[in-house]
Amino acid sequence: MSFDGKQLAHEILLTYKNRDWSQVKLVILQTNNDVSSDAFIRQKMNACNTLGAQSELIKYHESVTEKELLEKIQQLNTDPEVTGIILQLPVYPHLKQNKLLKAIDPYKDVDYLTGNCPLPIRSCVVEAVLILKEHFHHDFTNKQIVVVGLGVTGGGPIFHYLKETGHQVVGCDKHTPNTMELIKTADVVITAIGKPHFFKTTNFKPGVILYDVGVSRNVLNKLCGDIDPNGIEKVAKWWSPTPGGVGPFTVLAIMKNLWVLYEAHQRRI
């Protein structure tokens, strides 16, 4: 079973419109020339527009210095009109990604990439998977779960969340020698390696549940997931396509987190 994630996420997003978003503001800092990032940013800004929230994109040239960015982040941290800050990844190679992320005020870290926000929010990719899990009634109890790819914006947060919540989960990266063997016996596979159609139908057991978090472009510059969709419906009980699968729900999660940050800010005024 597959589904239209874009439509479903939009329907859920519309249920948030009963709140007053007029004083909510999201600022996105872009320090890359990545086409996929451009698409993700548009989705986030469109979601803000749908709900009536404010959004601002600040795009930097490759000549930007780390000092300039840190000063800008500090300015946004202290601006009472800014609710949430996103540093769109990846960053230019000469910039220290972790240093920039750590500079963001935890109370404005809408992506939860610092992991330091004391408010009840989660990493957007984790929240996206959990929204889908709940909506489609996927029970992970006593299931063998394999997460492939442990990057900071993809499989890493998902793996750590599942491990911390007591699930039977194994994390695989490029150093794992038996990844394919683990996948073949897994009940749930979550892929986040960013390689177009890397996994085939033959890699999975019948009845598997597949969350495809990876995003990349093939030789034709077409947006793809990690899992080849050709024939996958014959093996998988359920799978999320790319594009239009997990991605729209990460945007939904950002808006969900943004509202929590806004409410917390209002309480502190």
From Swiss-Prot:
Q: Which gene encodes it?
A: folD
As recorded in UniProt, its EC number(s) are 1.5.1.5, 3.5.4.9
Q: Which reaction does it catalyse?
A: (6R)-5,10-methylene-5,6,7,8-tetrahydrofolate + NADP(+) = (6R)-5,10-methenyltetrahydrofolate + NADPH; (6R)-5,10-methenyltetrahydrofolate + H2O = (6R)-10-formyltetrahydrofolate + H(+)
Q: What's the domain of life for this entry?
A: Bacteria
Q: Give the CC-aspect GO terms.
A: cytosol
Q: How does this polypeptide assemble, per the annotation?
A: Homodimer.
Q: Which InterPro entries match?
A: Aminoacid_DH-like_N_sf, NAD(P)-bd_dom_sf, THF_DH/CycHdrlase, THF_DH/CycHdrlase_cat_dom, THF_DH/CycHdrlase_CS, THF_DH/CycHdrlase_NAD-bd_dom
Protein name as catalogued? Bifunctional protein FolD
Similarity comment: family membership: Belongs to the tetrahydrofolate dehydrogenase/cyclohydrolase family.
* Function per UniProt: Catalyzes the oxidation of 5,10-methylenetetrahydrofolate to 5,10-methenyltetrahydrofolate and then the hydrolysis of 5,10-methenyltetrahydrofolate to 10-formyltetrahydrofolate.
Mention one GO molecular function. Answer: methenyltetrahydrofolate cyclohydrolase activity
Gene Ontology biological-process annotations: L-histidine biosynthetic process; methionine biosynthetic process; purine nucleotide biosynthetic process; tetrahydrofolate interconversion
Q: Which SUPFAM superfamilies match?
A: Aminoacid dehydrogenase-like, N-terminal domain (SSF53223), NAD(P)-binding Rossmann-fold domains (SSF51735)
Q: Which organism is it from?
A: Mycoplasma pneumoniae (strain ATCC 29342 / M129 / Subtype 1)
Q: Which UniProt keywords apply?
A: Amino-acid biosynthesis, Histidine biosynthesis, Hydrolase, Methionine biosynthesis, Multifunctional enzyme, NADP, One-carbon metabolism, Oxidoreductase, Purine biosynthesis
User: Hey, which pathway is this one from?
Assistant: One-carbon metabolism; tetrahydrofolate interconversion
- The answer on whether this UniProt entry bears the keyword Ribonucleoprotein reads no
